[in-house]
Amino acid sequence: MPQRSAPNAGAKSGPLERQARAALRETAHTLAQLEKRAAPAVAAAAEMILGCFENGGTVFFCGNGGSAADAQHLAAEFSGRYLVDRPGLPAVALTSNSSAVTAIGNDYGYDEVFSRQLESLGSPGDVLVAISTSGRSESVRRAVRSAQELDMTVIGMTGARGGDFAALCDVALVTPSDVTPNIQEGHIAMGHAFCLLVERSLFPRGTPAAGPRRTPRKPRGVRPGTGPRTRSRA
């Protein structure tokens, strides 16, 4: 079977490499704007999430398509770990329960798939992180309204054209772009930032995670400054 030769690193760049450079340059430009434009909102979101966890609450995430993947990704950073070994934190992606999503979608319509779950799972003081690149996803907007009726705090994540959606939320993390993939890249960058801030605040004595490791369960409330508990070996 003939072997394909490796690309010649010294050769003149071809059209695909030029397109790759342009795509990466656009991503870098979008992300570079976040420090100046989004840092205050990211800090505010971290403060809201921190207060929720300290008071024994749960952070919920929702979104559609790529934003559903982002919702699950960010929920896992809390319920698993981000950078340090520590107890898990109560975070739920409303996109994950396929039975609930399909049952509600079938019986009530897709627009209700997140709001209906919040009605049964959410409590006053909880936080909803609602992700919509366009700001027009009706299922996400209804989740925002349900969260507000439950006296939850709402953090919105959207793009440059999501002004109406952003206005519905207590704080909005806006990627300054109208290109969907770039908006999503900004969302993950900002999400990772608030995960970092919350984790550092709750677990300042946490140790960098070296690999898979079981951690003990924690009580429902998390006191600030407490590090992960360890089990001594007999």
Predicted regions and their residues:
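YjeF_N-associated NAD(P)HX repair module
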Residues: 189-234
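Residue-level recognition of alpha-helical structural elements
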Residues: 16, 38-41, 67, 148
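Generic N-terminal amphipathic, Lys/Arg-enriched alpha-helix
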Residues: 1-37
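A short, well-structured juxtamembrane/interface segment
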Residues: 36-55
